[in-house]
UniProtKB/Swiss-Prot annotation:
Residues 16-55 bind DNA. GO terms for cellular component: cytoplasm. It comes from the Bacteria. GO terms for biological process: negative regulation of DNA-templated transcription; response to redox state. The keyword Zinc does not apply. The keyword Chloroplast does not apply. It is found in: Cytoplasm. Modulates transcription in response to changes in cellular NADH/NAD(+) redox state. This is Redox-sensing transcriptional repressor Rex. SMART domains: CoA_binding. PANTHER family: REDOX-SENSING TRANSCRIPTIONAL REPRESSOR REX, REDOX-SENSING TRANSCRIPTIONAL REPRESSOR REX 1. Homodimer.
Length: 210
């Protein structure tokens, strides 16, 4: 997996900052301070300045940041100034919910292909995208210039699906299965295990009651 010098937590906060700036643009706000951004997203102003400093100098001391300019810079940093084509493997409840979420398009992500092995649902559509058999994976990745794969299959099938995605040329994978996956060094892998997030909540709840 690729290792980045910039902390992952910083990248996640940049995404939150960009969403907040988008909200300010919609409200007609033209300038904003680091303190106002901090108050809006729930971090310290020092943290905002530190996160932005990884990527250069923004804004004017004593004036703040031009909202639209900073928003545009953050989109570019996050790679959201271009379109990314996605393939979803697994069109069950989780895969279907992912495919139907409208927020991805606004952030630069297009669901370009959906695949499954269940003949009962192959041929049906999710938000205008036809569910196709897994055998077409390589063809669709090439045709549609797909760079991101989303895995929402049962754990036993997850590694096999990962191997197929890697072999087809997909360079980034979002894994919703609980399986620990292996990928080559040039493939970016992110795991999203919902149970882990619930366990994190349970830890803090228990900690507060000790």
């Amino acid at each position: 997996m690729k290792v980045f010098k910039i902390p992952e937590a910083t990248i996640m906060r940049l995404s939150i900052y960009s969403r907040y700036l988008r909200q300010l643009i919609e409200e007609g706000v033209e300038t904003v301070s680091s303190g106002e951004i901090a108050a809006g997203v729930g971090v310290s102003s020092a943290q905002v300045r530190k996160d932005l400093a990884y990527f250069g100098e923004f804004g004017t001391r004593g004036v703040g940041y031009k909202v639209e300019d900073l928003y545009g810079c953050l989109l570019k940093i996050l790679g959201l100034d271009r379109r990314w084509n996605i393939i979803i493997i697994g069109a069950g409840k989780l895969g279907s919910a992912f495919a139907l979420y409208q927020g991805f398009l606004d952030r630069g992500f297009t669901i370009s292909a959906i695949m499954d092995v269940d003949e009962k649902i192959i041929g049906s559509e999710l938000d205008g995208v036809k569910i196709e058999p897994l055998e077409l994976l390589q063809q669709r990745v090439t045709e549609k210039n797909i760079t991101v794969g989303v895995i929402t299959v049962p754990a036993p099938a997850a590694q096999d699906v990962t191997d197929l995605l890697v072999a087809s040329g997909v360079k980034a994978i979002l894994n919703f299965s609980p399986r620990v996956l292996k990928v080559p060094n040039d493939v970016i892998l992110r795991n999203v295990d919902l149970s882990v997030n619930l366990e994190l909540l349970s830890f803090y709840l228990a900690l507060n009651n000790r």
